[in-house]
Amino acid sequence: MALLVEKTTSGREYKVKDMSQADFGRLEIELAEVEMPGLMACRTEFGPSQPFKGAKITGSLHMTIQTAVLIETLTALGAEVRWCSCNIFSTQDHAAAAIARDSAAVFAWKGETLQEYWWCTERALDWGPGGGPDLIVDDGGDATLLIHEGVKAEEEFAKNGTIPDPNSTDNAEFQLVLTIIKESLKTDPLKYTKMKERLVGVSEETTTGVKRLYQMQANGTLLFPAINVNDSVTKSKFDNLYGCRHSLPDGLMRATDVMIAGKVALVAGYGDVGKGCAAALKQAGARVIVTEIDPICALQATMEGLQVLTLEDVVSDVDIFVTTTGNKDIIMVDHMRKMKNNAIVCNIGHFDNEIDMLGLETYPGVKRITIKPQTDRWVFPDTNSGIIVLAEGRLMNLGCATGHPSFVMSCSFTNQVIAQLELWNEKSSGKYEKKVYVLPKHLDEKVAALHLGKLGAKLTKLSKDQADYISVPVEGPYKPAHYRY
């Protein structure tokens, strides 16, 4: 696809695959709104006061139908928005088209190359001569990463004239990041520094991006305040757990039509995502094995009736492999060579480094047979047997299906709206330093409460005597910060 920004008749910039899908996207957005009571409640509560008036928000988060409802909630509250996806396969093109036509600048399409992906990220951050965004909604931390790497390069350039060398790294994706920064130095050697100075803060959606933020906080390089949305209970214990429980089997069946019942499935990692995946596979009739490094998570798995073994113990016996760790080098090419014919290998962690795709792609004589988009059979020459890899080792639930359903994403995205409001409303107060924060418990409980009515749930009310007896306010919060749900 030619990397040229287009404009709507109203002058809004965009780059999507097919604007003719906008009407279809609008119909699905309207369906999703009914399933997203938290976001709709935000529009009702905050819309009249327009709290985001004057705010420029950049989003780097999967451009799906559910995200479209988030974007239109931000614009309904007064924000200007520019958006890109945080994964090359996760965009739903009809959602991107509808938002580009009706609401916000969008730069996203399904099946981007890595070069196109980083071009889209750069466009979403580009607010013209006035600098960058005021706020960032990030998922995985790529928008945050680009700004941090850009500022670091600009400081080096100002200090000693050093220009980033893309060949200084073997990582093909990071080479593209350095190339973008190198080119920006030619036209504006303070581009990312000006972005940093304008930024009020970022709210981060997922485990992987949160890890990046805490690493930067620990080494003193975090450039602006950050709110960790992922560790809100109404995000991690719902989106990560119940969302994956729904979307993993959806992706598996759309990609392969395989019958899960009776199969041996291995889930690498038993955190919230792993728990949801293992539950889905078990409920579908698979015999589930878990791999874990953490004895507590391993013990939890055994108490759920799951086997806890090492990958090396069972690699030749497993039919379906799912990585959920957020780590790297979990399934290597030497493991893949030992797998049974047509074993399915997939990842539901954020990045593509859990599965050794580079080792697979460069294995001597290996043959790649594309069955359909994001479903490939790789045949090894020495065994003449193959494995099926989904979404090229990236997020299979969004690459091969449509990701988490609207209701559970409403929980996550309501947290995002509240986090963005918190950062924006406190921008001049000094409340938030260059650190990582978590939303307070009373807001977590508010997000949950906004979703109960849709499910027909009714809360029991504490009397004053009961509340005093357990030392909590009648209206909450009901649990201490250290409580484990």
From Swiss-Prot:
Cofactors named for this entry: NAD(+)
Domain of life: Eukaryota
Swiss-Prot/TrEMBL keywords: Hydrolase, NAD, One-carbon metabolism
Residues given in the record as NAD(+) binding sites: 206-208, 240, 269-274, 292, 327, 348-350, 397
An individual GO BP term: one-carbon metabolic process
Cystine residue pairs: none
Pfam families cross-referenced by the UniProt entry: AdoHcyase, AdoHcyase_NAD
Binding site for substrate: 64, 139, 205, 235, 239
Cofactor note: Binds 1 NAD(+) per subunit.
Keyword Nucleotide-binding: no
GO function term, MF aspect, one: adenosylhomocysteinase activity
Function: Adenosylhomocysteine is a competitive inhibitor of S-adenosyl-L-methionine-dependent methyl transferase reactions; therefore adenosylhomocysteinase may play a key role in the control of methylations via regulation of the intracellular concentration of adenosylhomocysteine.
HAMAP family: AdoHcyase (MF_00563)
Name by which UniProt lists this protein: Adenosylhomocysteinase
Taxonomic path: Eukaryota, Viridiplantae, Streptophyta, Embryophyta, Tracheophyta
